UniProtKB/Swiss-Prot annotation:
Stretch list, region RNA-binding: 1-149
Organism (species): Rotavirus A (strain RVA/Human/Japan/AU-1/1982/G3P3[9])
Keyword RNA-binding appears in the UniProt entry: yes
Function: Plays an important role in stimulating the translation of viral mRNAs. These mRNAs are capped but not polyadenylated, instead terminating in a conserved sequence 'GACC' at the 3' that is recognized by NSP3, which competes with host PABPC1 for EIF4G1 binding. The interaction between NSP3 and host EIF4G1 stabilizes the EIF4E-EIF4G1 interaction, thereby facilitating the initiation of capped mRNA translation.
This protein's record includes keyword Coiled coil: yes
Subunit record text: Homodimer. Interacts (via the coiled-coil region) with host ZC3H7B (via LD motif). Interacts with host EIF4G1.
Interaction with host EIF4G1: annotated span: 208-313
Disulfide bond annotation, renumbered to this chain: none
Domain of life: Viruses
Full protein name: Non-structural protein 3
Family membership: Belongs to the rotavirus NSP3 family.
One Pfam family linked to the record: Rota_NSP3
UniProt subcellular location: Host cytoplasm
Amino acid sequence: MLKMESTQQMASSIINSSFEAAVVAATSTLELMGIQYDYNEVYTRVKSKFDLVMDDSGVKNNLMGKAITIDQALNGKFGSAIRNRNWMADSRTVAKLDEDVNKLRMMLSSKGIDQKMRVLNACFSVKRVPGKSSSIVKCTKLMKDKLERGEVEVDDSFVEEKMEVDTINWKLRYDQLEKRFESLKHRVNEKYNTWVVKARKVNENMNSLQNVISQQQAHINELQMYNNKLERDLQSKIGSVVSSIEWYLRSMELSDDVKVDIEQQLNSIDQLNPVNAIDDFESVLRNLISDYDRLFIMFKGLLQQCNYTCTYE
């Protein structure tokens, strides 16, 4: 059996159409008042308020519940419809509805809508004539019932009374909106000017930082150039010292084996890396001192064998 949910879909469509109508009414009102707005913000705010009212008041659940009951009846399930009929015919339900009506009346009265205005609104409705400035006043069923019950009288001694109605002072409303707009404009300008000042300060700090970085980079480049020059000078000096020592070594009256040994130690000096060169010089000096020490010990032993003594003056 085909399951029908057309009533639920129609109720959901009516609720969605009501929301869209609320959005259109809100945006058109803002446009007529000359107020600039963000459509997405208006849409979000109206949707939030609409959903809250529909859910909190129970209107949405009530409509959807009745639609589900109708669909169930159309599908041959009359249990829910019978329960609703019994509920509507119950005296407690009638008392609850009367209580709700009385609450609504008191709420309208507290909002300044008195009994006279409520009765007139319930007895008459106004139909606008397309293309004309005039309107047609229509009597409702309540007015017809009052005529049949003789509850309508004609006052021949009618004295025009000023009806108390809520009027809107559009000039005052415009002045208020203009003040709010000017206040908002002033706050926006203040925030914009503050942002501009902060942006300028950030830009100045950035430029200053870039200048400092450029100066530091230039100083680093100078130090690098000085370091390279110093390294080249040290390499040149080390090479010159090694050459000078080799020349001096060749002029000495030493044996060829000693000269070859010292030259090998000099050739092992790293002339490209000054740090390694200093370590190599230290090693050469240690070896020379060690050789001198052994030579002195041998000389001292030879003197002792010859019955000579060695003194330092």
